[in-house]
Amino acid sequence: MKYKLVAFWLVVFGALFAFLQTRFEYHFYYIEQSQLFLFTEAYIRNKLLLPGGFSMLVAEFLVQFFIRPYVGALVTAALLTGVGVCTAGIVKRIAPVSGLFILYVLPMLALLFMHFDFNYRVQGTVCYLMMMALLCGYMRIRNDLFRLVAGCVLVPVLFWLAGSIAVLFAGMVCLFEGLRKTPKWYISL
């Protein structure tokens, strides 16, 4: 089963890469020229002082390479595949026996369509991937008390790293704890 999932995600990544490279190659060049990444200490420090500044730096760092052939499609396909893998981990944690592969791909498709907009920034996908990865890790914690404490710590950390996506993370944590009927789940509110 593990090899089946790896093969599935490799096929998804390859299909995304091929689609993006053949149909939207010049889109990535345009996106790169509309953003600027300065590799100076002052610029990085000023960005890191802002909530969500870390994700902004990561996104701008990745976008600067979109000028190179194939890199824009490669980075975008990798980010979207990462979102799909995290979604699969979350769905398997909630409903372990479901084999709904299409459910894993739906958030990827929504983000893919948003990437077609010239005004959409890669930072949104980076933030969403960070939130999904933390949520997937959060759901793997077995001890109820440790999980609730981790949730209370992760929300402000995620807000500092990725910005307002932390509100979605907090809502998903409350929903997860409420549906699991964790004793004193309301503490997560």
What are the functions of these language-model segments?
Residues 77-94, 133-137:
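Transmembrane-helix motifs of polytopic, lipid-linked glycan transferases
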Residues 14, 67-68, 80-84, 89, ...:
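Eukaryotic intrinsically disordered, low-complexity segments enriched for acidic and Ser/Thr/Pro residues
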Residues 55, 59-69, 92-95, 114-121:
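Helix-loop junctions on the outward
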Residues 169-188:
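Perimembrane helix-loop-helix junctions
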Residues 140-156, 185-187:
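Short hydrophobic alpha-helices at membrane interfaces in multi-pass membrane enzymes
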Residues 17-79:
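Membrane-interface coil-to-helix junctions
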Residues 1-16:
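Start-transfer (signal-anchor) and selected internal transmembrane alpha helices
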Residues 30-33, 48-52, 72, 76, ...:
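Membrane-interface micro-motifs in multi-pass membrane enzymes
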